[in-house]
Structures are given as structure tokens and as C-alpha cells.
């Protein structure tokens, strides 16, 4: 392919009314002909030829206004747009409901455009910034400023992303506690739908990630447009396929009426909207999100130790002797970090009391945590701890002393959830108290990791200031304790998004560690997040949530593709199980550099009961592929898997990788290459012919290692 010099390539514009932002795979054309900037093209790179505005000018239809209503990045009714507006709000007397912004100034480079819009009548300014990141991710940010003398009640600030009519299908992601990140496909012809969240945190039920694509788009084929709003509170993504025949996504934070007031000479910054385009299917779109995360959004920390969390091992039954024995076994099998979960602080013998009182319970730990930490450290492991700072139990000293610190609406009695209430994180005194408690804990003990939980939804409460307060507290703690890694947990995967990502190093993907469910949960979560930031643990033989039983090999094969951990009382494990687990962890450590830096991909398969995914090094020197049978299908065979990540003319050696006894279905003879131990194929052979697989039992995986012949 012809490659351009991206540093010297000039702007493509027929006149000053078209801006062309680009990188080597993406073009974004912004029209400035109207009152506000409008994205008129968002897709594959368009090349060097000059563009004319007529390319984007449509007919004016009868039966409506006498112009083709433009879809601005901020859509507004004053321009004839009859869909949802980008800015919704008013002054206290109800005026100002229809702001009319006009571009007052702009600047741009080849990868960014910055616009200042002004409504002189309402004394409102709006700053919009559009940027193409090196990963190919498009970001839109904006800030609304009140230059007048009256407060402005903002009800919504959302950005519009146009999608061409050929995008006929939608992929949305959501689920429930213990079964997050399920994928749902729906047709998108002439309809409008909304992915909307009112729960006050990112939520298990609906995820702020949406993909639109051409008919039957797949992992490696079809054109895909995706978006994400980086925010850990309420959000709304409206998918409009009707209004003026402009298919578009209207993306942003969801605000409750009266929740956000912009006072004179103050501003409000909207959550960042992230967008991707791929002409090669879903996996390519996700890889752009992954690259974006890796290259700058997250606080980089290369240490991702194998973790043992004590929750499912002992629950609230904290006992020094038991925990030191558990630490001994953990160190023996290769664990690198030992995490003490819920139950260590004052009054916390069950989930009805103690939240808010963040001091070590002297009745359980008469000598503090130092003896346990010293024992863990002597075994060569790091020590981590669990907390849930945003919550409080009514049965706690904190609540008895400060009942007014609880988040509530008006005079109504707040509703408990999991026997707990929510602290008002908008209050600086609340945040200062929590900062002091957690800082004292981190200063007193050698703690390298904090699992930060959030175990209930908000009810009848504004989420905006609550979310910002949590960000501020986490940011302060990260700044003062840069050596500590933080994990975002919210009853599992209830708070995973780009908004909280700068403040944390890891996410707890789901409270369910059942490997059969986790296969689908992790697939969905990796649509946005790279595997190395997702906690993937090997659970006990019987899942504590589903009560299903699975082999260690299957549990390990599932947990391999992420930040590995253990959620299992290893004191109950047999010597054989411990030895097997030690072997798995040793294998993981050799694969960790590949798994945490390579290109993560999914592949389509004709049998919906078969999942194919993997990770390939950027130079294709090595790869690991998983083939999983979720359930029995119409055929006993596993049809060949077609792998599209590899250079056509390069040669590769393919070998099976066994983490235990292979779970082959009944057979007389295996494919010859498996008995032989390897096979050599070109990249073209892998994509066109496919790799022949063995017959698999339900709930089992077959792992393949691929090495490039240099």
C-alpha cells in the first residue's frame, strides 16, 4: 500500500468551510458552513484529493423547513433540526430553552479542531474540541460557560455522531449482576432507541458502549462505528434512525432536572465521548480502544502480580492462623499478591455493620494487620486490602456521628441496599474524612493495592456531583500514594469505563467466576478494555454463584486471558490440585508479556456454541488462541477455525497447549497434527483453510500456541 508522509501532508479542503482531520486510516470531515460545526463524514481515510462541499449537500425535501437541516456536533433547533438538541437547559424563569450558538472562532491541525461557539443573546459560550488520537480513536470534548448574570439550569449536553444509512445493525452491551457485558444485536432501520442509565454508577444493566455496523458485521468483516461516553454516572446514548433521515448517535451524560446549575462566570465540562471506526469488523474497532487505553489514558504501571483474594476463601471469618496458612499455600503455587477482602475493619463481622469505620478491628486483629502483612511479605508476596469508602452502614460510628453525611433526596428516608447507605461524595468534609482514613491506613501498613468497591445503586439521588467527588478523592489518593494500585469494583463489573480509568489500574470484571459465564462476560468487556486491566480469577471447583462445577483446566483457560488471580480456598485443595495450579501460574507468567501487550482479537465461527479468541504479538512472533465449546451443538466436530490476524505469506508453527488433561469428546482418532504435536501453516492457509480442531466436550477449551518462523 502507498504510505503518505503524515507529518507533511497538507489539509484537504476546497475552502475554509471544510476541515479534514485524518490519520492513516481515519478521516473526519467537519463542515463549518452552518452556525455550528457539523461532522459530515466519519470513516475510512479519503486520500489526498481535494473535497468539495457539494459532496455533502443533499436535496431539500417538501413538507418541512426550506433547508436540509444540518446535524451539528451540537444539534440545535434554531438551525431547523427537529430531533433531540445537543444543549438542553433554561434560566430560572424558563427562558433560554432554545440556545442559538454560532461559531465565533476556531483553530485546527491535521488531527484536531477547536471551536468556540457563542450565543450572544443568552450570554453562553460553548467550547468544542475534536481530536484524533494516534490509536485512531476520535474524541469529542466540550465545556459550556455562563457569561451572563443569571444561573443556567443545564438539563443535557450531548454530542452528535453521524452514522451512514448503510449501518443497519446495532450491538449493545449489558446484563445483570453476575452476568455483565452480554451482547445484544438489533436491526437499526427506521427506529430510535436509547441506551440509558439512571443507577448513579456505570451499571451492570447497561454499558455506555454501542456499535453500529453494516448488515451482519462480524469480528473480522463489515464496517463498524462505535462510541463510548467516559463517565461513571448516569448516561444516555440515543440511537436515532428517523430524524430527517440522519442516522446518528447522540451521546453524553444524563442529568436530572435541576441537578446541574451553571452559575455566572462558571463552566461545565461534559464527559468525553470516544468513537472508533473500522472497515474490518469489531475486533479492529476494539483494538483501537485497547491501544488508546495503553498509550496514555491509564496511569501506566507494568507490575500486574498474580493475585489471591480471600473473599471466597474465608468471607468474613478472619482468623490469623487460617490466613497465614492460606498465604503459605498461595506463595507455594506462585501467587505474587495476597489481598485481604471485606471483614478486617471495626464491627465488620457481617454485612450489616461497620462500613464507614475504616480502622482495623482490634477484636479480630489485636496486634493490627502488621503480623499478617509481615508474614505475607516474608513469603515474597505483596499485600492488598479491600474497602468501600463511598458507603456507610446505619450500624456504624460514622453514621451515628454524621447522619447528615448520607446521600438523600429532600426529607424522604433514604432506601438501604445491601444494608447500607451512600455517603454524599459532593461534600468536601466527607471526602476529607475518607482521605484521612485511607491515607492513615496506607501510611501505617505496607499496602500495594486497594480493591475499591461500590456495592449498590443510587436511589432518587443526583449522580453528577457524586461521580466528580469520587474522582477527586481517588485522584488525591493516587497523587499522595503513587505506589499503590487501585482496582475499581462495583459488585463486579458495575463501574468499568474510561471516566474512572485514569484513577485506577485494574477492574474487577464480574463477581461471577464461573468460567462458562466468564467466557461471555470477558468477551463483552474486551470490546472496550484490553485484557490486562480486567481481573480474571481462577475460582474453586464449584462456582459460588452458579453452583456449577468445572475442571481446573477450563477455569484456568478462561482466566488466562486477563490479569490473573485466584478466588479459591486453597486450604481445601488437594496436593494434586495445588501442583496443577502452580503449573498453570508458571505457564501464565511466561505468557504474561504477550497477553498484556499483544493485539487481542475475536474470530467468527459458524457454530454459535464455539468461541474463538486470542492474542497476537504486534510482530506476530507469537500468539495464543483459545477455542471453547460452550455447549453441545448440531455437530460433534468443531469446524476449522479461520484466523485472520496473520500475514498471508509468513510461515507459522502451530502447537497445542495443554493446561491439564485434554477435554476431548469421544473419538477414535484425533486430527493428525495434534498427535504429531505441531503443524506448519502460512497465514493465508490459516485464514482460508483454517486450523482443524479436535472434538471438544461442553464447557472446555483447546489452546493453541502459534510461533512465526523467522
Label every PLM stretch briefly.
Residues 10-11, 17-21, 26-28, 37-240, ...:
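Polysaccharide-binding surfaces and accessory modules of carbohydrate-active proteins
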Residues 25, 142, 265, 308, ...:
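Conserved, mostly hydrophobic/aromatic
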Residues 67-71, 77-100, 217-235, 276-298, ...:
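Glycine-rich, aromatic-flanked loop segments that form ligand/cofactor-binding clefts
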Residues 101-103, 260-279, 699-707:
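Short Pro-Gly-centered flexible turn/kink motifs
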Residues 207, 219, 605-648:
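Carbohydrate-binding surface patches
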Residues 301-436, 449:
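Aromatic-lined carbohydrate-binding/catalytic grooves of carbohydrate-active enzymes
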Residues 366-368, 400-402, 406-551, 563-568, ...:
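Active-site neighborhood of glycoside hydrolase catalytic domains
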Residues 631-710:
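C-terminal beta-sandwich/jelly-roll accessory domains of carbohydrate-active enzymes
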Amino acid at each position: 500500500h502507498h504510505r503518505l508522509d503524515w507529518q507533511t501532508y497538507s489539509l484537504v479542503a476546497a475552502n475554509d468551510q471544510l476541515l479534514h482531520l485524518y490519520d492513516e486510516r481515519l478521516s473526519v470531515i467537519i463542515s463549518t458552513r452552518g452556525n455550528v460545526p457539523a461532522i459530515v463524514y466519519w470513516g475510512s481515510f479519503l486520500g489526498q484529493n481535494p473535497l468539495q462541499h457539494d459532496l455533502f449537500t443533499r436535496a431539500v425535501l417538501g413538507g418541512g423547513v426550506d433547508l436540509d437541516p444540518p446535524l451539528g456536533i451540537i444539534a440545535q433547533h434554531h438551525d431547523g433540526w427537529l430531533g433531540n438538541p445537543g444543549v438542553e437547559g433554561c434560566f430560572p424563569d424558563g427562558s433560554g430553552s432554545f440556545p442559538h450558538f454560532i461559531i465565533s472562532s476556531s483553530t485546527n491541525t491535521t488531527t484536531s479542531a477547536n471551536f468556540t461557539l457563542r450565543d450572544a443573546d443568552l450570554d453562553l459560550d460553548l467550547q468544542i474540541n475534536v481530536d484524533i488520537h494516534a490509536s485512531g480513536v476520535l474524541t469529542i470534548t466540550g465545556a459550556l460557560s455562563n457569561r451572563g448574570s443569571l444561573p443556567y439550569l443545564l438539563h443535557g449536553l450531548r454530542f452528535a455522531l453521524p452514522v451512514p444509512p448503510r449501518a443497519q445493525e446495532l450491538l449493545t452491551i449489558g446484563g445483570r449482576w453476575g452476568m455483565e457485558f452480554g451482547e445484544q444485536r438489533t436491526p437499526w432501520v427506521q427506529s430510535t432507541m436509547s441506551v440509558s442509565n439512571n443507577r448513579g454508577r456505570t451499571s451492570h444493566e447497561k454499558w455506555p458502549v454501542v456499535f453500529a455496523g453494516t448488515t451482519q458485521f462480524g469480528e473480522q468483516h463489515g464496517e463498524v462505528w462505535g462510541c463510548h461516553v467516559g463517565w461513571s454516572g448516569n448516561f444516555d446514548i440515543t440511537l436515532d434512525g428517523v430524524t430527517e433521515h440522519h442516522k446518528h448517535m447522540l451521546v453524553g451524560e444524563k442529568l436530572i432536572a435541576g441537578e446541574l446549575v451553571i452559575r455566572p462566570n462558571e463552566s461545565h465540562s461534559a464527559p468525553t465521548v470516544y468513537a472508533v471506526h473500522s472497515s474490518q469488523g469489531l475486533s479492529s474497532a476494539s483494538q483501537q480502544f485497547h491501544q488508546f487505553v495503553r498509550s496514555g489514558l491509564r496511569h501506566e504501571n507494568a507490575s500486574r502480580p498474580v493475585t489471591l483474594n480471600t473473599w471466597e476463601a474465608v468471607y468474613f471469618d478472619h482468623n490469623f492462623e487460617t490466613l497465614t496458612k492460606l498465604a503459605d499455600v498461595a506463595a507455594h503455587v506462585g501467587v505474587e499478591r495476597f489481598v485481604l477482602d471485606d471483614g478486617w475493619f471495626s464491627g465488620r463481622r457481617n454485612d450489616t455493620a461497620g462500613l464507614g469505620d475504616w480502622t482495623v478491628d482490634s477484636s479480630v486483629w489485636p496486634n493490627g494487620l502488621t503480623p499478617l502483612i509481615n508474614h505475607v511479605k516474608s513469603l515474597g508476596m505483596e499485600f492488598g486490602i479491600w474497602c468501600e469508602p463511598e458507603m456507610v452502614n446505619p450500624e456504624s460510628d460514622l453514621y451515628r456521628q454524621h447522619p447528615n453525611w448520607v446521600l438523600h433526596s429532600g426529607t424522604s428516608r433514604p432506601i438501604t441496599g445491601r444494608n447500607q447507605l451512600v455517603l454524599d461524595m459532593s461534600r468536601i468534609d466527607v471526602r476529607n474524612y475518607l482521605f484521612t482514613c485511607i491515607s492513615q491506613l496506607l501510611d501505617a501498613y505496607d499496602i500495594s493495592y486497594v480493591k475499591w468497591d461500590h456495592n449498590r445503586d443510587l436511589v432518587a439521588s443526583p449522580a453528577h456531583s457524586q461521580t466528580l467527588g469520587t474522582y477527586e478523592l481517588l485522584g488525591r489518593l493516587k497523587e499522595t500514594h503513587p505506589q499503590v494500585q487501585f482496582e475499581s469494583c462495583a459488585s463486579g463489573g458495575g463501574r468499568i469505563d474510561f471516566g474512572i480509568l485514569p484513577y485506577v489500574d485494574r477492574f474487577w470484571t464480574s463477581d461471577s467466576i464461573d468460567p462458562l459465564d466468564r467466557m461471555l462476560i470477558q468477551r463483552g468487556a474486551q470490546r472496550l478494555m484490553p485484557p490486562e486491566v480486567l481481573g480474571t480469577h481462577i475460582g474453586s471447583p464449584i462456582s459460588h454463584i452458579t453452583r456449577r462445577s468445572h475442571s481446573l483446566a477450563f477455569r484456568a483457560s478462561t482466566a488466562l486471558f486477563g490479569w490473573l488471580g485466584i478466588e479459591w480456598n486453597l486450604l481445601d485443595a488437594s496436593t494434586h490440585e495445588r501442583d496443577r495450579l502452580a503449573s498453570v501460574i508458571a505457564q501464565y507468567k511466561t505468557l504474561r508479556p504477550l497477553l498484556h501487550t499483544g493485539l487481542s482479537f475475536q474470530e467468527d465461527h459458524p457454530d454459535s456454541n464455539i468461541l474463538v479468541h486470542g492474542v497476537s504479538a504486534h510482530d506476530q512472533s507469537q500468539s495464543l488462541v483459545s477455542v471453547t465449546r460452550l455447549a453441545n451443538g448440531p455437530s460433534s466436530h468443531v469446524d476449522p477455525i479461520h484466523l485472520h490476524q496473520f500475514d498471508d505469506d509468513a510461515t507459522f508453527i502451530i502447537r497445542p497447549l495443554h493446561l491439564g488433561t485434554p477435554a476431548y469428546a469421544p473419538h477414535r482418532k484425533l486430527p493428525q497434527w495434534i498427535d504429531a504435536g505441531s503443524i506448519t501453516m502460512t497465514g493465508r492457509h490459516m485464514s482460508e483453510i483454517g486450523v482443524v480442531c479436535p472434538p471438544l466436550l461442553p464447557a472446555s477449551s483447546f489452546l493453541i500456541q502459534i510461533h512465526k518462523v523467522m
